[in-house]
């Protein structure tokens, strides 16, 4: 099943019993978070709050709260286990697009051409009179307080826009970048754009500030896009492919786009059937900025981007289960808000796993596996435990071929995809260990690891600035554990042989099992 927009997806989920409408008044301040958190932990449905207290726009939460709904958003209709397997097919597609194998036969060349044609056929198309511009707020009508923006946790600095799909373009690029960055509401038409320095939006902004210093930087934020476009924004799409093209491949139909209506922002294109679109600029700082509050980190002072308006963001409850530190980020000034009639506001919360980002991480883990295997054929499985905050720990299963092989794989994972740059812990195991079973992983660690020999520590590496365990913000250490069987050269002792029952005995007991009535 393919979905043309968010409403189509909501209808499909409702038909499958995967969405529940909440007709009772529920406040966006804390109450929605508590309700969504309880439902997600129980593996329950997406929630559509029809009557959010104090607001007229319905709120959609827990949209991707199970792996099955993530797979449905990518066009795969299956239960959780089958859905995860199907997501590996999407990873194989991305792997083929990222690094196509050279054709060995004429038949292979034909497949490669077919794939290239499929990508070309999914180039987005621009439409006029799009649904996302049925209603336009401008001037004094622009008031973000009219939207039911959630305040998720008691210690949060204020309301937080969480599922905003941010559209940017660098000065030297033809393709647009789509990224999901949280945004703190600080005024009628002002949001703090929290994008980390290595993310696409921040890179585009810095390049623009260098090339066009003192010029406003155009930005659009999409709320309530179709599921394929949203998931395309969080998937490791190859640089040669736009997220809109990838969404078209998932959907099986070209992504329809609309030009923004605000002068200066109209070079950006947004999904034509989106629910709500915010259009505006990051403006240069006018006059001397106010001094930083006492105890706050210093304002950014280096680089062209430092000359733009910034504000102190946070603290907010984050996917780690803790409140993050405050930090300075650019201010996004909203000039216009466009929307569909009867628009739906899409939101989420982040907190101690499991939360929606953790579920997305479990699903996207399956997309990563073929990408890693393309580069490292010895990797046989890969798992990012959701308890590890989506990316901070990885368990790698491999087919070991020589002494020191596990350490090569550790450094390969850390360096291959940007998504693993902040992975703090990597545990490498053999093929006989199920990476998704903590009992087996701990057994391998406690029986195959000598702490001095098999622990790899790497200092002064990039670390998520939200990681308060690191000694300084953004810089910390990483740890690898080689929990594989050791080869000659790695140990001087005779290595233990795992206990395994005789195959003939197991077969006989299988028959007895039923006869005894134990099954």
Swiss-Prot record:
Cofactor(s) the record lists: prenylated FMN; Mn(2+)
Pfam families noted in UniProt: UbiD, UbiD_C, UbiD_N
Subcellular location: Cell membrane
Reactions mediated catalytically: a 4-hydroxy-3-(all-trans-polyprenyl)benzoate + H(+) = a 2-(all-trans-polyprenyl)phenol + CO2
Domain of life: Bacteria
GO CC entries: cytosol; plasma membrane
Keyword set includes Metal-binding: yes
GO biological process: ubiquinone biosynthetic process
UniProt remark on cofactor binding: Binds 1 prenylated FMN per subunit.
Pathway given in the UniProt record: Cofactor biosynthesis; ubiquinone biosynthesis
Annotated keywords: Cell membrane, Decarboxylase, Flavoprotein, FMN, Lyase, Manganese, Membrane, Metal-binding, Ubiquinone biosynthesis
InterPro entries: UbiD (IPR002830), UbiD-like_C (IPR049381), UbiD-like_N (IPR049383), UbiD_bacteria (IPR023677), UbiD_Rift_dom (IPR048304)
Membrane topology: Peripheral membrane protein
One Gene Ontology molecular-function label: metal ion binding
EC number annotated for this UniProt entry: 4.1.1.98
Active site residues according to the UniProt entry: 318 (proton donor)
Positions that bind Mn(2+): 177, 243
Quaternary data: Homohexamer.
Function noted in UniProt: Catalyzes the decarboxylation of 3-octaprenyl-4-hydroxy benzoate to 2-octaprenylphenol, an intermediate step in ubiquinone biosynthesis.
Similarity comment text for this entry: Belongs to the UbiD family.
Protein name per UniProt: 3-octaprenyl-4-hydroxybenzoate carboxy-lyase
Lineage start: Bacteria, Pseudomonadati, Pseudomonadota, Betaproteobacteria, Burkholderiales
């Amino acid at each position: 099943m393919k979905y043309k927009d968010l409403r189509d997806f909501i209808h499909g989920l409702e038909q499958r019993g995967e969405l529940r409408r909440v007709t009772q008044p529920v406040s966006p301040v804390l109450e929605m978070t508590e309700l969504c958190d309880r439902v997600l932990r129980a593996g329950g449905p997406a929630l559509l709050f029809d009557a959010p207290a104090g607001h007229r726009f319905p709120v959609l939460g827990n949209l991707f709260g199970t792996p099955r709904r993530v797979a449905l958003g990518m066009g795969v209709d299956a239960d959780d286990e089958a859905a995860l397997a199907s997501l590996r097919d999407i990873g194989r597609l991305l792997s083929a697009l990222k690094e196509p194998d050279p054709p060995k036969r004429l038949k292979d060349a034909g497949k490669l051409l077919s794939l290239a044609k499929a990508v070309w056929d999914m180039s987005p198309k621009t439409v006029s009179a799009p649904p996302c511009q049925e209603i336009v707020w401008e001037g004094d009508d622009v008031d973000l307080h009219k939207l039911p923006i959630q305040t998720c946790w008691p210690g949060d600095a204020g309301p937080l826009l969480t599922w905003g799909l941010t559209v940017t373009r660098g000065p030297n690029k033809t393709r647009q970048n789509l990224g999901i960055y949280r945004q703190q509401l600080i005024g009628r038409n002002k949001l703090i754009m929290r994008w980390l320095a290595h993310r696409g939006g921040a890179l585009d902004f810095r390049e623009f500030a260098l090339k066009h210093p003192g010029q406003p930087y155009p930005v659009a934020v999409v709320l309530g896009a179709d599921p394929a476009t949203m998931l395309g924004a969080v998937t490791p799409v190859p640089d040669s492919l736009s997220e809109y093209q990838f969404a078209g491949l998932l959907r099986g139909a070209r992504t329809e786009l609309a030009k923004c209506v605000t002068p200066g922002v109209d070079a950006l294109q947004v999904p034509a059937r989106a629910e709500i679109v915010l259009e505006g600029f990051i403006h240069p700082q006018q006059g001397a900025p106010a001094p930083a509050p006492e105890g706050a980190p210093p304002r950014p002072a280096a680089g062209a981007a430092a000359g733009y308006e910034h504000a102190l963001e946070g603290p907010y409850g984050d996917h780690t289960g803790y409140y993050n530190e405050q930090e300075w980020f650019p201010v996004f000034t909203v000039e216009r808000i466009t929307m569909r009639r009867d628009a739906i506001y899409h939101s989420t919360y982040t907190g101690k796993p499991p939360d929606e980002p953790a579920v997305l991480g479990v699903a996207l883990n399956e997309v990563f596996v073929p990408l890693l295997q393309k580069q490292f054929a010895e990797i046989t499985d890969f798992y990012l435990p959701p308890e590890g905050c989506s990316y901070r720990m990885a368990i790698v299963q491999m087919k070991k071929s020589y002494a020191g092989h596990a350490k090569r794989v550790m450094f390969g994972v850390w360096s291959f995809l940007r998504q693993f740059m902040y992975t703090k812990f990597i545990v490498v195991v053999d093929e006989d260990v199920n990476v998704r079973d903590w009992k087996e992983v701990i057994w391998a660690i406690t029986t195959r690891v000598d702490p001095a020999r098999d622990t790899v520590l790497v200092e002064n590496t990039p670390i998520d600035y939200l990681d308060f365990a690191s000694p300084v913000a953004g810089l910390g250490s990483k740890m690898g554990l080689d929990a594989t069987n050791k080869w000659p050269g790695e140990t001087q002792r005779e290595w233990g042989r795992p206990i395994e029952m005789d195959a003939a005995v197991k077969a006989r007991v299988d028959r007895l099992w039923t006869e005894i009535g134990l099954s």
